[in-house]
Each structure stands twice: as C-alpha cells, then as structure tokens.
Design a protein with these regions (language model features):
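Predominant activation on well-ordered alpha-helical scaffold segments within soluble catalytic domains
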Residues: 76-80, 163-170, 180, 207-214
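His/Asp/Glu-rich mid-to-C-terminal helical/loop segments that flank catalytic regions of hydrolases
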Residues: 186-218
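Metabolite-binding pocket within alpha/beta catalytic cores that recognizes anionic/polar moieties
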Residues: 1-125, 155-156, 171
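Glycine-rich beta-alpha junction loops
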Residues: 29, 94, 134-137, 164, ...
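Zn-dependent metallopeptidase/amidohydrolase metal-coordination segment
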Residues: 168-198
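Active-site rim beta-loop-alpha module in soluble metabolic enzymes
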Residues: 116-172
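Conserved active-site and cofactor/substrate-binding residues in soluble primary-metabolism enzymes
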Residues: 31, 73-77, 160-164, 197-208
C-alpha cells in the first residue's frame, strides 16, 4: 500500500493525517478509551473520521495516537492506516481455562485465526502470556462451536478483535502487542451478570492494565 493511499485511509478513519508516529494504542472499549485519555493527558478528540481518536506525547517526547476502534471485523481497518508502527491493543476476553478467572490480566503471545493460521505477537513480558483463539461471540450455540474448536487447538482465551487485528498488523508490517482482562467465561459467566466480587476484581484489573500500558509507553 502506497503512502498516498495510507494518508487517504487516515483521513477517512481518523479525520486527519498523522506522521512520525511511534506508537498507536487501540481499544474497542469506550471506558478504557476515556481512562487512557485522562492518564495520557490528551486534550482534543478528533471526531471527523469514523473512529474517535486523540494524539499524545510521552514523557520522552514520542508521538502517539489513541484510537477507539469498533468491535467486530471492522476493528482491523485501523491496521491498514499504518505501517512499521507499534500498535498496542487493550480489550476484554473470554477464558477457556478454569485457572484463568474473571479479572485476570493477560498478554497474547499467539493469535490463532479461524483458518488455523497462527500469528506471533510482541509481548511486554510482565504478565502471563497465552494463546488467543477466535470466537465471534461468547454466548449461545455459535459461541459453543467456536470456543470448543479453540479449546481443541489449545487456546487459553477467545476474542474476535485480536485475531483480526493480528492478521492485519502482520500484513502491514506493524509490531502488534495485545493485553486483555478476562471478562467472561463463555456460556457460563457473562460480563453483564458478574457478581459484586467479580466486578470489583475486574474493575481493579482493568485499571491496573491501563496504567501499565501508559507507564510502558512513557
């Protein structure tokens, strides 16, 4: 993809063209976007494109961008707007292992795509690293089918966006790191039905993960 096409894609998705970026933080979670905006002391939010986004500078003077991406297959679109950039993903995931409980912070070392392809990710090496499988949802018959397949493939968790983004990042020669907090046990515990204890653990873990990402890039 040429620079001209990338710039046009940036204008469409972000509402502006960005240059000399070293790091891009992406998340499909609106509360995480707001939290990171405060931590990174971002000011203006660009709303002229498809994705809300805001720029920031680290304490070392490195230019970065924070982007609220959509959930689902469209999440990967942002990957095509950059090349040779470190992209850091934060999101939630469903656990397939009984010892990976609600509120566990994890790094993704491998993304297993629906076609069986495996993609290696960059890791921080600060939290446990796991294999992430693909599932388009976490409830119902479709979730059962995909989660069962992921479990057989020795995946520890499932998430849709990580798999799509990992593939697109590889195609565009981006360095991709993903950190998640476990929010669901597919077809057993739903995020919206967490008990008070699990909610508190989950909230604390989410804040800890976001603080870690902000500290890491600084």
């Amino acid at each position: 993809m040429t620079d001209k096409i990338k710039q046009q894609l940036q204008k469409t998705l972000l509402g502006h063209v960005v240059n000399d970026l070293k790091v891009v933080i992406i998340t499909p979670i609106s509360s995480a976007f707001k939290k990171l905006k405060l931590i990174l002391e971002c000011t203006e939010i660009y709303k002229n494109g498809f994705f809300d986004n805001t720029d920031f500078k680290t304490q070392n003077g490195i230019s970065g961008l924070l982007v609220l991406i959509p959930q689902g297959v469209s999440s990967q679109d942002i990957m095509y707007a950059f090349s040779d950039t470190h992209i850091i993903f934060f999101g939630y995931a469903g656990s397939l292992c009984k010892d990976i409980t609600i509120g566990t912070i994890l790094e993704i070392e491998t993304a297993r795509l629906p076609d069986g392809q495996s993609i290696s990710l960059e890791v921080f090496n600060s939290y446990n690293s796991v294999v992430c499988g693909y599932s388009p949802c976490l409830l119902g018959e479709i979730a059962f089918k995909y989660c069962e397949k992921a479990f057989v493939e020795k995946c520890h968790i499932v998430d849709m966006e990580i798999c799509y983004c990992a593939y697109a990042a590889k195609v565009n020669h981006n360095k991709f790191t993903a950190m998640v907090v476990v929010s669901d046990i597919p077809n057993t515990i739903n995020f919206w039905e967490l008990c008070k204890y699990n909610k508190e653990n989950f909230k604390q873990a989410s804040n800890q993960a976001l603080e870690y990402i902000a500290t890491y890039i600084n």
